[in-house]
Amino acid sequence: MSVSLSKGQGVSLKKNEYDLSSVTIGLGWDINEEKKGFLGGIFGKKEEEYDLDVIAFLCNSAGKVTDLGNVENGKPTLVNGDIIFFNSLRHKSGNIWLTGDNRTGAGDGDDEQIIVRLNSLDAQYEKIVFIVQIYNGEKLQQHFGKVQNAFIRAVDARNIEMARFDLSGGPAFASQRSMVFAELIREATGWKLRAIGEPSESDSFVSHLRNYM
């Protein structure tokens, strides 16, 4: 039975209870529809499309990201390192990857997914942090206040939902454009999924990355 988490809560995903050979971390969301005028009242046309991205940081025992990817002109590019995002979809180990980029949130179920082979993940990785951002949110004046029915969930290799964290928007999130959504923490008997839900006004995951360096 899936465990529904509240902010700050965690649940153990034990190897003897679930198949952790391949775990799907799914993210989903809806955008509030705004009706304008007579035609808007008929069709309920969305005011705009939101592009939400999910990002994963692979951290060591100290909770830090140590590999920032390829270096160009003396600066790390974050590509082919320990960060999984839209410009670096697959980790070099082959044990964690992003399935694609949904730019609208349309449709039922997961809008974006990160697949993790937890049983095969190198021992040096003790934590995986999941960030959600609104791409170009500042430029487009978009924010989580209009994001509804947002969730992150963990599903094992047998398609059994193990845990879920639901987080809707609202006035309190009207200036927030990114969020530390959840994290996976390695335990002796498996992994723990912890719900965080800490928002930020920045629309870039890089602002969160600084806390893990």
UniProtKB/Swiss-Prot annotation:
Family: Belongs to the CAPAB/TerDEXZ family.
UniProt keyword RNA-binding, yes or no: no
BP term (GO), one: response to tellurium ion
Keyword Heme in annotation: no
Gene3D superfamilies noted in UniProt: sav2460 like domains (2.60.60.30)
The protein's role, per its UniProt record: Not known; seems to contribute to the tellurium resistance (Ter) mechanism. Also involved in phage inhibition (Phi) and colicin resistance (PacB).
PANTHER family documented for this protein: CAMP-BINDING PROTEIN 1-RELATED, GENERAL STRESS PROTEIN 16U
Sorted UniProt keywords: Plasmid, Tellurium resistance
Gene designation: terX
Pfam families associated with the record: TerD
Name of the protein this chain belongs to: Tellurium resistance protein TerX
Organism phylogeny: Bacteria, Pseudomonadati, Pseudomonadota, Gammaproteobacteria, Enterobacterales
Superkingdom to which the source organism belongs: Bacteria
